[in-house]
Amino acid sequence: MALNDFHVSEPYTLGIELEMQVINPPGYDLSQDSSTLIDAVKPQLTAGEIKHDITESMLEMATGVCRDIDQAAAQLSAMQHVILQAASEHHLGICGGGTHPFQKWQRQEVCDNERYQRTLENFGYLIQQATVFGQHVHVGCANGDDAIYLLHGLSHFVPHFIALSAASPYMQGSDTRFACARLNIFSAFPDNGPMPWVSNWQEFAGLFRRLSYTTMIDSIKDLHWDIRPSPAFGTVEVRVMDTPLTLDHAINMAGLIQATAHWLLTERPFKPQEQDYLLYKFNRFQACRYGLEGVLTDVYTGDRRRLADDTLRLLDNVTPSARKLGADSAIDALRLQVKKGGNEAQYMREFIADGGSLIGLVQKHCEIWTGQ
């Protein structure tokens, strides 16, 4: 199967996707009523899109093409308002977080959608287990070769993005001991982790053609790498973040990725090579397991450094780009988060340590999403 040409888009424009949990009070388990909610809100949208994800307990909010994080925030805030209003009318709750802490995957109903039903046929129970919730950020690129360079550049910072957004310590009623357990769900999929090595868009087209020979890949949407090019949109899409508990944190993460993309494409600080990825999964694991307390290992020198320290270095590097893009408030907020030493996974554990229950935790997450 041939790959579509890379659609030229304005560099550094962005789009944000948030996979939200649809909750059924008073037990605060996942609901199976996302279709009802989506049908209720679609006529009220003026910008962006609200749509299904894999199962009936998931709802995706997606912005249109945005020039900066302020425009993206306005679109997401408007969608948040209409979703919460409809959820209240249907006696449902909405919240963020990368996993629901006690749902059972066997109860999850795959959406009545041709693509998702085909995916269920290919992957079986793995699809129901993939009832987890992430944030994806698209960044515009001028051409396919820039997209491949940007993908490799951003891959250096996958651990940083994971650690800052980690919000999935609980799963199936247990503390997983991970800051981000969500990404472990995808480890059984054949397209888990980093994209196979290519050095330019022509090589990527060849890779896609070979992947299509498997008959499991019909489009880019069927590839679930940590970062992937999206030729139809003319973007690179970062897919490793847990859905945050607040809209503000989602905007901050998008601002960081946009600023990092600008820094990478204007400064070109790396010369990508295949060896860059030799320790990729080890460093990724450190971020998932320990969050900002993880330790990164340099593939070339063997030097080890705290992920928190390296994240502060990244934030300093991208600050000039953030100022040019109007994203400096996002960088300031994330810098403060790192210096305080926490993420949302840590907050969740503190809630439980203080005597809270998992049911109470989900209730609290719904309150946080409504601004209470």
From Swiss-Prot:
GO terms for molecular function: ATP binding; glutamate-cysteine ligase activity. It is an enzyme of class 6 (ligase). Pfam families: GCS2. Keywords: ATP-binding, Ligase, Nucleotide-binding. Gene3D superfamilies: 3.30.590.20. Belongs to the glutamate--cysteine ligase type 2 family. YbdK subfamily. ATP-dependent carboxylate-amine ligase which exhibits weak glutamate--cysteine ligase activity. PANTHER family: GLUTAMATE--CYSTEINE LIGASE 2-RELATED (PTHR36510:SF1). This is Putative glutamate--cysteine ligase 2. It comes from Salmonella agona (strain SL483). The gene is ybdK.
